[in-house]
Regions:
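N-terminal secretory signal peptides that target proteins for export/translocation
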Residues: 1-2
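N-terminal and secondary-structure boundary signal
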Residues: 6-8, 19-188
Length: 188
């Protein structure tokens, strides 16, 4: 099961440690937000280190590998240092809307074409199906269907880029983790 989840966006790092207490009806604490002036591989590592919460166990690095032929993804040369530092495996689930990442073999090709397989292993977590995770205290959801490989990871680092998304409004860290680890049934 996942111990802790951290979201690292281009301009800030936002610990999601308050989520558990918020689900339980307790008042959540305001998160700390870290800013950097220049987005570099070194500053990505610096902002991660500022959390003082090292990734432990088997580490998933959730990001978007981008659509085939597209350019809307974090460049591997920007994130390589942080992925290497945490010893991470890049993880995603197949898309539910068709396109070049709807089938595992095509998804892996897109990841390779965009340079991600050159910096770390890539795991398409729903390649072997899905699992149901309980949602504690959920108002609208009692369970969430995610890729069957997700429970293999002990720690998740989420690297996100903010964007306008034709199908779902704005996309960023919350969309990256919610839709990005969901199986096709979990996206429905």
């Amino acid at each position: 099961m996942i111990n802790r989840m951290y979201v690292i966006t281009l301009l800030s790092v936002l610990p999601f440690t308050a989520c558990g207490s918020a689900q339980g009806g307790e008042k959540a604490e305001a998160p700390e937000v870290y800013f950097i002036r220049e987005i570099t591989p070194q500053n990505m590592v610096r902002i991660y280190e500022a959390l003082e919460r090292p990734a432990t166990g088997k580490v998933a690095v959730k990001l978007s590998t981008g659509e085939p032929g597209g350019h809307n993804f974090l460049k591997p040369e920007l994130i390589k240092d942080i992925v290497t530092k945490v010893g991470g495996t890049i993880v995603e689930c197949n898309t539910a809307y068709g396109g070049g990442r709807a089938r595992t073999q095509d998804h892996l090709k897109a990841a390779a074409d965009h340079g991600f397989t050159a910096i770390a292993p890539v795991d398409i977590m729903d390649a072997d199906g899905e699992v149901s995770l309980p949602v504690k205290g959920g108002k609208h959801l009692k369970e969430n269907f995610v890729g069957s490989h997700y429970p293999r990871y002990d720690f998740t680092v989420v690297l996100s880029h903010f964007k306008g998304h034709a199908m779902g409004g704005f996309g960023g860290a919350v969309k990256n983790i919610s839709i990005g680890i969901a199986s096709s049934a979990g996206k429905a």
